């Protein structure tokens, strides 16, 4: 065996032994070893300098051994680098491992908005009384919003409801009454009376302040059937108020005017803060205005093809914001819409 072959064998054995000693923490040591063995001034290059002393017959053989040694050492360095990287990744994963048996961070539970809570409570009251809940369009026709409610185009009461018009005949509804008109059109009175509520968002051209908003929520109710009287309306209103504000509450009806009811009334509830004695909430009167109501105007019935000499009905409407403000002592309607979590969290 020639001297070069012996040197190659010794270099391979020493290098492979050194690679086995290198750990992931000493990766630079492997790079230094690679340069010292395979670099331009490395050990293998020094061995090759002895080729000038090898006979011409032996040079191909020795050259083959040199190439084999270079290939073996190069593969060994690559394999070691791969192993070190795998160990490094494994160590990192181990340090970042998660104990899946540990309890997780609690997820903050959401809750319904106070207006949603109020609406659902009111709807549940009416569902328990046999009413159906009917939804309708927020973008409505002038015909259903006004004319079907006994408000023709030249009616002075239209000035009471400043309206967001999209076109001359299309608008954002100012109340949920159009839902009632469509329901009367579709109802089969041969199967019994119509009892419904129509909750939803409505729009008025009001300037936003503590008690007014350009959008708010209404729940309007309607009952149409045979022999429906003012006494039925009063009894229904009394029951509704007691379920919303407490069994001890009483109501008072005051004459009023609405184009779609005749007679029309404003409904007051006995003050739930002072019990009727008079306080700042009821403005010393002992009563708080809560909703409007009345007997359905015969013209409204007739526009749905209902014989007003046979059928009669009553209607009422109240605002969810109004109910929530009274129940929870809220003094600014804007709080419902500003998205302040501090406000919402009070009503979990």
UniProtKB/Swiss-Prot annotation:
Pfam families: Phe_tRNA-synt_N (PF02912), tRNA-synt_2d (PF01409). Transmembrane segments: none annotated. The keyword NADP does not apply. Mg(2+) binds at residue 262. It catalyses: tRNA(Phe) + L-phenylalanine + ATP = L-phenylalanyl-tRNA(Phe) + AMP + diphosphate + H(+). Its main location: cytoplasm. The keyword ATP-binding applies. Keywords: Aminoacyl-tRNA synthetase, ATP-binding, Cytoplasm, Ligase, Magnesium, Metal-binding, Nucleotide-binding, Protein biosynthesis. It is found in: Cytoplasm. One of its GO terms (biological process) is phenylalanyl-tRNA aminoacylation. Its EC number is 6.1.1.20. It comes from the Bacteria. One of its GO terms (cellular component) is cytoplasm. NCBIfam families: pheS. PANTHER family: PHENYLALANINE--TRNA LIGASE, MITOCHONDRIAL (PTHR11538:SF41), PHENYLALANYL-TRNA SYNTHETASE (PTHR11538). Tetramer of two alpha and two beta subunits. This is Phenylalanine--tRNA ligase alpha subunit. It comes from Streptococcus pneumoniae (strain JJA).
